Design a protein with these regions (language model features):
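Acidic, low-complexity/disordered tracts enriched in E/D and polar residues
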Residues: 111-176, 206, 219-222
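Aromatic-enriched hydrophobic runs in primary sequence
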Residues: 22, 39, 54-55, 80, ...
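Generic signal for short, ordered secondary-structure residues
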Residues: 13, 58, 153-157, 166, ...
Length: 222
């Protein structure tokens, strides 16, 4: 048997008609929902994804998306062109018709998002700091240099060079609080304003800041 060669071809090269040129019942076709499909060993299941989850899943399947201008913004725009996004886990694609029908009968609006532009530098590296345990009341923290970021549905995806980091909960709130230098008290106030009061909120913020410093996503202002 002759070996096969894998190649990349544009739809037009394969004779595939662009959807913008197709109609149904006299109306132009449009994309109704956006799915990220994954083959599994058993069963067919459709689940909603947050935009941040969809971004990280999509990024894992690419090798050079970070070379795009504003890479996360470019992907977020693509992933919100239609309802969803959704995760389709399938073992038999031919048995997914009912799931697709449900999407058409109950369309979902795409999520909103906020773009937080970074430096655009794809050569950045995550550099951890161990200063969290010795922070004083007057010490101030700010976001470490990053390439691009997207905030949506209480989650933030931060791209540092070629590495995406998904933050949620207090992590997302604390990172979002630091476009300019903030003390721990100011970060705590912003996290509580975003997520609500909690009897252990100070401990939670302290631990979160330590984690963000160790991950290289926040840095202490010298």
């Amino acid at each position: 048997q002759e070996p096969t060669v894998k190649g990349d071809h544009a739809p037009a090269e394969l004779g595939i008609t662009p959807a913008t040129e197709l109609t149904f019942a006299g109306e132009p076709l449009r994309m109704a929902a956006l799915l990220i499909a994954e083959r599994v060993s058993q069963g067919n299941k459709l689940e909603p994804l947050t935009l941040a989850e969809a971004l990280t899943k999509f990024i894992a399947q690419t090798s050079s998306f970070y070379l795009l201008p504003n890479p996360l913004l470019t992907l977020a725009r693509a992933l919100t062109l239609a309802g969803g996004p959704w995760q389709l886990n399938f073992s038999y694609q031919a048995q997914c018709a009912d799931l697709f029908k449900q999407l058409l009968e109950h369309p979902a609006d795409p999520p909103s998002y906020q773009h937080i532009p970074g430096s655009g530098d794809v050569n950045l590296k995550l550099t951890s700091s161990s200063m969290g345990t010795s922070l004083g009341d007057s010490d101030r923290l700010v976001r470490a240099p990053y390439t691009d970021a997207i905030y949506s549905e209480w989650q933030t995806v931060v791209l540092v060079g070629t590495v995406p980091v998904l933050l949620d909960g207090a992590g997302a709130a604390a990172w979002m609080a630091c476009p300019i230098p903030h003390t721990l008290a100011e970060i705590h106030a912003d996290v509580v304003a975003a997520l609500g009061e909690h009897r252990k909120s100070w401990n939670l913020v302290d631990e979160t800041v330590d984690t963000l410093l160790a991950a290289g996503l926040l840095q202490v202002v010298e």
